[in-house]
């Protein structure tokens, strides 16, 4: 799927939305260490019995290390913000003149290295928030990259999220919490078929195969893994594929592996890196949240051809 030709909505109303507050634990860490230091002053001993300065420093260093070890044993999920709103706004302004697809790819790349969201529902859904950038699954990465790319401010990105993440439209309570996440897009195929996330380009990528659908879909079109690999081998490069920056790749699960009728098993975002003016000198990458629910992983940037070769899916849309 591609958002080629999509333009930023100019009539979006400004929305006053307070981004989630930082966790108190985030600010508590230095306080904890400081109290440890103050609670262990250098003992007032006589000159004959006073510890040498180097030994006292070593003892204090070990005490601090022990304190931090205990802290992280009890609070192993402490995380740091992805980007503060000031940096988000600055980057939005910096890339505002680029095509929307390129902006999507650049924002997706910003998430590379972000821990995978192991929450089965998605942490953003469980917490009923729009912004939860500390962790990402493939759906959240797709949502957020588009929202940030199509907006000029963090607040505007939230407004776009209310329009795009939901089958109808998202609603926020007075406390900034989402009231109707049950109305969100939960299936990749629903996103694709809605037409609200761009134009489908499946038939432009290669030979189309039909497989059994589900949830009201009789048949579903895709380019099979085998045909895609043949195209990659025959051209000796993925550069011949009609892919552009910001294109979404929806990976199709085998019918027998579906658990709740899902057709799409994963989503990734294309990023093109041009080595020269020649089309043959461009490299195609896939940015995706690689992980397993209840286990972990991270957002990765990998060669498109390498991912296709090793992926557990039967095709793409």
For each of these PLM feature ranges, what is it?
Residues 209-258:
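A mid-sequence, solvent-exposed acidic-amphipathic segment
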Residues 80-218, 259-260:
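N-terminal capping segments
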Residues 248, 261-274, 282-288:
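Catalytic nucleophile-His microenvironment captured as a short glycine-rich beta-strand/loop
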Residues 290-317:
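C-terminal regions of proteins
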Residues 8-14, 20-25, 34-37, 41, ...:
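A cross-taxon signal for low-complexity, glycine/charged-rich
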Residues 253-255, 288-291:
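A mature extracytoplasmic/lumenal domain signature
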């Amino acid at each position: 799927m591609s958002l080629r030709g999509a333009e930023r909505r100019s009539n979006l109303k400004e929305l006053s939305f307070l981004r989630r507050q930082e966790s108190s634990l985030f600010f508590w860490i230095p306080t904890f260490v400081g109290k440890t230091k103050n609670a262990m002053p250098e003992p007032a001993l006589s000159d004959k019995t006073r510890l040498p300065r180097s030994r006292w420093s070593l003892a204090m260093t070990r005490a601090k290390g022990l304190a931090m070890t205990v802290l992280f044993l009890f609070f192993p999920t402490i995380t740091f913000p992805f980007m503060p709103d000031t940096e988000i706004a600055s980057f939005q302004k910096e890339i505002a003149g680029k095509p929307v697809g390129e902006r999507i790819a650049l924002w997706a790349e910003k998430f590379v290295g972000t821990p995978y969201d192991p929450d089965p529902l998605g942490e953003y859904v469980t917490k009923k928030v729009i912004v939860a950038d500390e962790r990402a699954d493939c759906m959240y990465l797709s949502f957020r990259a588009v929202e940030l790319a199509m907006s000029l401010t963090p607040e505007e990105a939230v407004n776009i999220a209310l329009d795009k993440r939901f089958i109808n439209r998202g609603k926020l309570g007075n406390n900034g919490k989402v009231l109707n996440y049950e109305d969100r897009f939960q299936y990749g195929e629903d996103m694709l078929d809605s037409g609200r996330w761009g134009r489908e380009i499946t038939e432009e990528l290669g030979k189309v195969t039909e497989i059994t659908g589900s949830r009201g879909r009789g048949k579903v079109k895709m380019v099979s893994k085998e045909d895609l690999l043949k195209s990659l081998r025959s051209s000796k490069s993925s550069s011949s594929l009609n892919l552009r920056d910001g294109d979404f790749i929806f990976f199709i699960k085998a019918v027998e592996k579906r658990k709740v009728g899902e057709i799409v098993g994963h989503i990734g975002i294309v990023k093109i890196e041009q080595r020269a003016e020649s089309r043959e000198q461009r490299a195609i990458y896939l940015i995706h949240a690689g992980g397993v629910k209840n286990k972990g992983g991270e957002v990765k940037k990998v060669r498109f051809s390498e991912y296709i070769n090793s992926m557990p899916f039967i095709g793409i849309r």
